[in-house]
Design a protein with these regions (language model features):
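An interfacial alpha-helical scaffold signature
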Residues: 1-170
Length: 170
C-alpha cells in the first residue's frame, strides 16, 4: 500500500508521465493506493508509468509504461527475455528468413498503440506504421516491433538512435 505524492502526476525523463507514489508515514492517515489495482483502474488506460519514493531526482523505483503493460498482460512487472541472443538490429542478412506482420492486440493492445501514436505525433512523426518482425535465432524465433522511421527523418544518427531507444519506454 502506498500514499499518493503531491503532485500526483510528474513528467519524468524524456517527457514521459509518471504517477507519484510514496511509502505511508507511520501513524498518519492516508488514502491507500494499491499498485496492482492502479494498473487496471487507470495506469494502463492512460499510458502512465509510476515513480515510487522520489527524493530529489532519485526514486527508489521507477516503472515505465512498458512495465505497467507487462503487469497488465503477464501479472509481473518484469519478465526475463526468453531468448538471450538477439540478432543484430537494423540489418537482415541475405539468407535470413523473417516473417513480417501486424502485431496482435494481445501483443500490442490498442491502449499501447494509442499511447505510442500520441508520443510519435508529439515528436512530429505522423502516420508511423508498426509491424511485428519474427526472426530465427539459434535459440528459436524472436519477435521485435519495427517502425517505419528512418535516420533521414532526424537531425543526425545519434538523435535517431536516441529516439528509437526512447520507444522502449512503452
Amino acid at each position: 500500500s502506498f500514499r499518493c505524492g503531491d503532485p500526483q502526476l510528474l513528467t519524468g525523463p524524456g517527457g514521459f508521465p509518471y504517477f507519484q507514489l510514496l511509502l505511508p508515514e507511520s501513524g498518519t492517515a492516508f488514502e491507500c493506493y494499491v499498485l496492482s489495482h492502479m494498473v487496471d483502474d487507470f495506469l494502463f488506460e492512460r499510458g502512465w508509468g509510476v515513480v515510487i519514493n522520489l527524493k530529489g531526482n532519485q526514486p527508489d523505483w521507477l516503472l515505465t509504461y512498458g512495465d505497467v503493460v507487462n503487469y497488465k498482460l503477464k501479472k509481473e512487472f518484469y519478465s526475463a527475455p526468453q531468448i538471450s541472443e538477439l540478432p543484430p538490429t537494423g540489418v537482415i542478412q541475405q539468407d535470413e528468413q523473417v516473417l513480417v506482420g501486424q502485431p496482435s492486440d494481445s501483443l500490442l493492445p490498442p491502449q499501447v498503440r494509442n499511447a505510442m501514436r500520441q508520443y510519435l505525433e508529439f515528436h512530429g512523426h505522423h502516420g508511423v506504421k508498426i509491424a511485428l518482425l519474427t526472426r530465427m535465432t539459434s535459440q528459436g524465433p524472436v519477435q521485435q516491433l519495427i517502425f517505419d522511421l528512418a535516420p533521414e527523418q532526424f537531425a543526425d544518427e545519434p538523435t535517431y538512435q536516441a529516439f528509437l531507444q526512447s520507444l522502449g519506454w512503452f
